[in-house]
Structures are given as C-alpha cells and as structure tokens.
Amino acid sequence: MADAPIAVLTEGNGRVHVVHLIDDSVKIKGIGVLNPYTTLNDVGMGEEVQIGSKIFTRLPPRLPELVLGMKRRAQTIGSKDAGVLIARLGIGAGDVVLEAGLGSAGQSMHLARTMGSSGHLITIEPREEHSSVGLENLSTLSKALPEFPKHDHIDGRIEDSFDRIKEVSNDVDAILLDLPEHPSAIQAAAPLLKIGGRLSCYCPVSSQLE
C-alpha cells in the first residue's frame, strides 16, 4: 500500500474518496469491497465507474480533492485559513518552514503544495494518535504531487525540541503554531527564525481543547 498509486473518486453528492490502487481485495468505507487496482486502473480521468449500486467519477488527485478525502482525527485548518497564513508569511519555493501542531496535516498539505521539491517542511506533534493520521495524509499527498518538499517530523513538544530542530535546520523562514497554548511555544521557536522570518499562531476553538 505504501507504494501504490493514488486514485480519486467523487460521488454525485460531492463526497470524495482517496483510494490506493493496491492489487488485493479490500473493504473501503463508503465504497464497498473491491480490488482497487483491477477496478480502477483502466478507468480514465473523467470517466464513470459503477461499484455496487453507486456511480463514481475518477478525477486527477489534486490538492482540493485530497484535502476533501483526507483522513481526519484532529480538527483541521481549512483551505481558506491555510491560504491566508501562507500568503501572510510569504511562504514559497525553497523555504524552510516549521509547523508545530501537525494534527491531521491539513495545513501541512497546503504548505507542501506551495513549497515544492526545493522546500523543507519540519513538523512537530506531541500526540502520536494525531501524528499517525497526519503523516499518512502527507504520505498520500507525496504520491500525488509532481513535487514534494523534504520533510522531517519530530515527535514531542516544540518547547522540548529546540536541539532536534537545529539538527535538521539551523534556522527557518516561517513558523506556524497550531497549539492550545502559544506563549511558551513562541518563546521556544522565535530564536529559530531567520532575519525577516515570520511566525503565526492559529488559535484553536473550544472543541479542540477538550
């Protein structure tokens, strides 16, 4: 599954499914039991395919579809907010970006698309149950994009990870914090910024703190 190509299927109601084209019989939530490779490999982009009683349309695996079909555990940053943060921080190709609070990787997916193969994305997440989902989503995205940044992930809190960050990059162009508490994280992360670098804080809603 790790090396299987990606297919995107959409339903008439707009629901999106991201399918790994493995050559084996599997049960996929919302679709049913099928062999993804034999069922979908010869279906062209824009063509319809019937699986069970449902009709699906195959689309190219682009960022909007992959975000809609991503696995979720933590509440994700939406595309609108992700775009604003990327623009305000001036993030682009070749940048080194640190994101603390990987979660399900909604923000990281937008970052990866923007940064391209010349960028370097560093993610930090203290909760393994969240990072496992986020890293899987990033792995899926890496198979779909023509370019994907260098990626280093650190398990732990940003306040405790300064030395580990320095091991992979001496400094960073931008920092994004999506955490319940920001003051201590800002104090820990700010010294990593290059001159002219920028830092943003995304404040969680109450449900994320529960």
Give the role of each language-model region.
Residues 186-210:
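C-terminal substrate-binding/active-site "lid" region of AdoMet-derived donor-dependent transferases
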Residues 1-60:
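N-terminal auxiliary segments of SAM/dcSAM-dependent transferases
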Residues 124-182:
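S-adenosyl-L-methionine
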Residues 92, 115-116, 193-197:
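Helix-to-beta-strand junctions that scaffold the AdoMet/dcAdoMet cofactor pocket
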Residues 104-117, 191:
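Conserved SAM-binding loop of SAM-dependent methyltransferases across substrates and taxa
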Residues 69-82:
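Conserved SAM-binding loop and adjacent beta-strand
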